[in-house]
């Protein structure tokens, strides 16, 4: 028979799992300019390019939000992605954000869903102001639109 403490412990666990699920759109509004999956290379270097996330165009300097609570695993410059943040959310979930103009977090920092982690930019391999947003489940990229609406 479950005790009150058992039930409270289970409720805390469920709330932690819910907070780890990347369901928050990472910008206020914006327009998807490139979807997850195969696409033409936007720079014309190849006829086919695999795109592991979605690109969300927005105003330069608009805030970028953590899609779920977690720990900043990486924050800095990454080739191609420019100013980049990767968040470990637990339960197999990670998110990554690229091309930002400025970062607002550091590696090792804890963030809550909705915290500002950076600002929309065009750093790295980019054609204009946007944030590249990736969701990984157990290390595999997945279409962010399956979780975030």
Residue ranges and their predicted role:
Residues 1-27:
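Non-catalytic extracellular/periplasmic "stalk"
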Residues 22-149:
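Catalytic cores of peptidoglycan-degrading enzymes
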């Amino acid at each position: 028979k479950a005790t009150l403490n058992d039930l409270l412990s289970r409720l805390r666990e469920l709330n932690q799992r819910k907070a780890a699920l990347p369901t928050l759109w990472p910008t206020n509004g914006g327009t998807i300019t490139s979807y997850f999956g195969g696409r033409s290379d936007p720079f014309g270097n190849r006829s086919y390019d695999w795109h592991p996330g979605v690109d969300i165009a927005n105003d330069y300097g608009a805030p970028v939000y953590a899609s779920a609570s977690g720990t900043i695993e990486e924050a800095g410059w990454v080739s191609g992605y420019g100013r980049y943040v990767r968040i470990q959310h637990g339960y197999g979930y990670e998110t990554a954000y690229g091309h930002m103009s400025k970062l607002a977090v550091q590696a090792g920092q804890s963030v809550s869903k909705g915290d500002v982690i950076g600002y929309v930019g065009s750093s790295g391999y980019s054609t204009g102001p946007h944030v590249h947003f990736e969701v990984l489940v157990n290390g595999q990229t997945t279409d962010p639109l399956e979780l975030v609406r």
